[in-house]
Amino acid sequence: MKWLGNVLVSPGEGGVYGERTLDGYRVWDPYRSKLAALYTLGGGVELTPEMRVLYLGAANGTTVSHVADYVETVYAVEFAPRPMQDLLEVARRRRNIVPIMADASRPEEYAPFMEAVDLVYQDVAQPNQVEIAERNLVFLKPGGHLVLMLKTRSVDVRRDPAEVLAGARTGLEERLDIADVRWLDPYHHDHAAIVCSRRE
């Protein structure tokens, strides 16, 4: 990852969503991006030029555009029509983004467009967030990583966020090795990142 002092940046062409630039780099704001928050807090998976990433819950492509600055290919899955319009515009400026309009809980819908990936990044705020991540492990290479951004209030607004996180972790441990778990405060309240690796 590229840092200018304590500021996380990415090396692509700016102006994607009105982000600031610094010395020719795009500032990656942890208050706007949960992945940037994870890196700022000392966690995350290093993004490298040869990586292929499956990004679930691409939304309007803000974080996707930064990931694309670092890696070979980003398969960006989004289901909602309005954000998809913005994502398509981002993909026109980032040729290594493959926008896919599909339901992330049904990976069989986009399997024909996929190849094996090094990283699955899951940011779909649904009650079955863990299940969605697990269904998409079919695309993850052995030794690859899963980063799950858990929005605890979307899983169960009545339960304590720590309990929700513990349950998600237990579910993932059945198939993956947990590398890191951390809350994203102060950047994103009641959000936690779970970083896992697939067993060889």
From Swiss-Prot:
The keyword Disulfide bond does not apply. GO terms for molecular function: histone H2AQ104 methyltransferase activity; RNA binding; rRNA methyltransferase activity. The keyword RNA-binding applies. Gene3D superfamilies: Vaccinia Virus protein VP39. S-adenosyl-L-methionine binds at T62, T63, E78, F79, D103, A104, D123, V124, A125, Q126. It is an enzyme of class 2 (transferase). It comes from the Archaea. Keywords: Methyltransferase, RNA-binding, rRNA processing, Transferase, tRNA processing. GO terms for biological process: box C/D sno(s)RNA 3'-end processing; tRNA processing. Pfam families: Fibrillarin (PF01269). Its EC number is 2.1.1.-. Belongs to the methyltransferase superfamily. Fibrillarin family. Interacts with nop5. Component of box C/D small ribonucleoprotein (sRNP) particles that contain rpl7ae, FlpA and nop5, plus a guide RNA. Involved in pre-rRNA and tRNA processing. Utilizes the methyl donor S-adenosyl-L-methionine to catalyze the site-specific 2'-hydroxyl methylation of ribose moieties in rRNA and tRNA. Site specificity is provided by a guide RNA that base pairs with the substrate. Methylation occurs at a characteristic distance from the sequence involved in base pairing with the guide RNA. HAMAP family: RNA_methyltransf_FlpA (MF_00351). NCBIfam families: PRK04266.1-2, PRK04266.1-4. This is Fibrillarin-like rRNA/tRNA 2'-O-methyltransferase. It comes from Methanoculleus marisnigri (strain ATCC 35101 / DSM 1498 / JR1).
